[in-house]
Amino acid sequence: MKILILGIFLFLCSTPAWAKEKHYYIGIIETTWDYASDHGEKKLISVDTEHSNIYLQNGPDRIGRLYKKALYLQYTDETFRTTIEKPVWLGFLGPIIKAETGDKVYVHLKNLASRPYTFHSHGITYYKEHEGAIYPDNTTDFQRADDKVYPGEQYTYMLLATEEQSPGEGDGNCVTRIYHSHIDAPKDIASGLIGPLIICKKDSLDKEKEKHIDREFVVMFSVVDENFSWYLEDNIKTYCSEPEKVDKDNEDFQESNRMYSVNGYTFGSLPGLSMCAEDRVKWYLFGMGNEVDVHAAFFHGQALTNKNYRIDTINLFPATLFDAYMVAQNPGEWMLSCQNLNHLKAGLQAFFQVQECNKSSSKDNIRGKHVRHYYIAAEEIIWNYAPSGIDIFTKENLTAPGSDSAVFFEQGTTRIGGSYKKLVYREYTDASFTNRKERGPEEEHLGILGPVIWAEVGDTIRVTFHNKGAYPLSIEPIGVRFNKNNEGTYYSPNYNPQSRSVPPSASHVAPTETFTYEWTVPKEVGPTNADPVCLAKMYYSAVEPTKDIFTGLIGPMKICKKGSLHANGRQKDVDKEFYLFPTVFDENESLLLEDNIRMFTTAPDQVDKEDEDFQESNKMHSMNGFMYGNQPGLTMCKGDSVVWYLFSAGNEADVHGIYFSGNTYLWRGERRDTANLFPQTSLTLHMWPDTEGTFNVECLTTDHYTGGMKQKYTVNQCRRQSEDSTFYLGERTYYIAAVEVEWDYSPQREWEKELHHLQEQNVSNAFLDKGEFYIGSKYKKVVYRQYTDSTFRVPVERKAEEEHLGILGPQLHADVGDKVKIIFKNMATRPYSIHAHGVQTESSTVTPTLPGETLTYVWKIPERSGAGTEDSACIPWAYYSTVDQVKDLYSGLIGPLIVCRRPYLKVFNPRRKLEFALLFLVFDENESWYLDDNIKTYSDHPEKVNKDDEEFIESNKMHAINGRMFGNLQGLTMHVGDEVNWYLMGMGNEIDLHTVHFHGHSFQYKHRGVYSSDVFDIFPGTYQTLEMFPRTPGIWLLHCHVTDHIHAGMETTYTVLQNEDTKSG
């Protein structure tokens, strides 16, 4: 404790005089909140009243649109009598708190509610007594006073906008941060206690407004889960007409309390988002919530920039912090929607008005300069997801009993099989729509996708669209400019179903009708200087986006810099271009589902469309509509310059990690081999394949991988090339074994028990408590462990700085130009292997090592395995076993490989550099090879276990950091003044979206510039370096910010000690 107080004293002494002091008087009040205060008049036409009533209509056992909530309000002074009015568009968010680097901010908090709450801020410096978060951190007395502000009490939090937590060099002048209550953070936030904190660079504000910005807006995208609110019981009693009938565990009841909202307003009811055409607008965005909170915020009709990159869709997850700049264009009322298709249906949209205020425009009118004309029809086809009938990976028939693929391809009484009637976009030669354009070999990989629409900056695109289908359809483009008369999305902000008003033709092209769209490509929508030459974009039908897209109506678009394309549309200096659309095509949502049941099942009248197994059989995990390696045309030559355009659409299941085995690519200055994609994301990746062979392009999300979202790409030796000129200077040899062990996810339960005691909660633990027949916290697992030599007798003891690795294999190191030799002994009872991301190998096949055998694996580390020029000096890759990469991973086989740039020599760095590798993974023990062993060994009543029981399955999903839960990961210790590299790794399934939050400090990361945050998003296949310079002593929380993951124990602490050099004897 003495050390801690001394540290704070020294920190204060070394801090420069604070530029200015700011005082905010914030009260926590309880009030009634209306999620749709304009009675739901504004909405997408395709959202029927019945759908909105699920969430907005109260009844005997439904709460409806009104909820009791706790909110932060701002007051004028310490009397807490007079509130300061906030902009209406803030909704239920707390007031905006702003600070510039060098400011000292005092938040005077008064709790006017009926239960204890706090104020915890992100991305700003505070000492332990101003953290506002309760967890076991060894603090006592005065340092605990901030942890709970009881009803009627006050507490003053002091926050310091220090240099270490200011926006990074590459960030905008002001960045998004947040504050919220943190006793049980998910419950406090669900109850309403969340608000925006905006941190700015020094001298970037003028009278509290960012200079050179005309309007600013803060928006939170969140599925606010009222089931987690502290006031659920009150809301049931107050708003349900027969509260005694309510079953809180009923799924439909729970869904009715999930409010898909922007700032607490749902179904387009958010007021006040208004601006002038040509206004310079700054958007501060963040997400909040749970696994369902996979958001794609889309600004219809506008183009934005973030970190100097052109964007139009922003992916937000729980606690993702984002800001974007926009010059408002196109007068009219536009939608700001979440393009997660499930969210779109459930009311997650708002409207913003762009008014004509006669501001002078610097934009030239580019219409008519160079017109590219496309003739595109929507037509019906029968589409086969795997024309060969074979799983190209296993060489088995797709309907082989017990195979992963049989679920999707079996045809029978109530199963459709692998062929579906679909609607697709196809290109014709002219407006007569008689001659279809044939696709050449370069295009055969496109599969189900529509034709590539391409244009350069300065072009006008004209698309004559003919609807040969039986439903009204449209074309909505992403990434070009159009006016309201050319918008393909079907909505009317003030639509009244009784008026029977006719929707505009562009957004509702009736069957047999034709419409010509006109879009332009001004400089403001094209690639920026930082962007690649061409941006991947997309177009789709948006009359009912969910149904239209899943029916098959989507295609790729690329928008390129002026003068960068050949006459045939291919990019200059590029040999091959490929378009990949990974998605889970949900055929249950298709417009043609009834037709498919009639055509392909043998007993259509017996089909139950609500049956879960029937629904699962229609979820086609595909790339361009192909599954299990059936995609043709992915061939290239060694040494080619290859551009991959990736894009996706869908819902929260569409969390993709697209892994290119055998090669790496460059993206935003970073070297990677796995690209993360989400609904309506698009990416442009540049690859120079350097090894011949056949490799996989696959989704690492485990359900997608087993479900068939994997293909093969081939690199041929097409021309004589000089041998690999890399001179491999160093050779490193590691002796690694696969060893079976007993692993305890939570060897100590004290931290967890103290946490619940501090929160005044008495909760059982579904994951760690054994109960009558659950497994508990101990499982048999297999892990990678290092040995001293080839005898494999003496294991290498882990040093103190390696204690944090937990279940992970040893942290392997290599420099660019090294050759890494892994002597691998399989000391386990079944075949395993060892394979690393990012490296170069002689063969594309990874040979399994049988039990008892030893094999040698060689990994070369050429330039393309190391960091990009604008990346951190050292980058992480994962290594794991690929015999069955899903079961092997969940059984425990994974570790980090750290690759550094050759000139990066630690000798020249006088400061102490620490390295911590962290794997955030929900270990699904149901998928482990050892599940049966674990039931036999650890369940008290193995004979009572039903492996298909939902609660049993859930109890085996261990939400862990390096295989430890609830504060059990030890060894994350550093000193003030250290330089720390955090190597974050993500693997796993659809639920493995992790927003990693560090209390007490921010970190820096690089994407062609240096950026700062205290939350980083990771997904299956994310490997990222974060750099931290700890300054504030204390024990600090480190956790995933996703609601269920917090409650399930994905939390630990890291310790910052005072620097020994500054201690006085």
From Swiss-Prot:
The keyword Glycoprotein applies. Cu(2+) 6 binds at H994, C1040, H1045, M1050. Binds 6 Cu(2+) cations per monomer. Coiled coil: none annotated. One of its GO terms (cellular component) is extracellular exosome. SUPFAM superfamilies: Cupredoxins. It is found in: Secreted. Its cofactor is Cu(2+). PROSITE patterns: MULTICOPPER_OXIDASE1, MULTICOPPER_OXIDASE2. Cu(2+) 2 binds at H122, H180, H1041. One of its GO terms (biological process) is intracellular copper ion homeostasis. Belongs to the multicopper oxidase family. This is Ceruloplasmin.
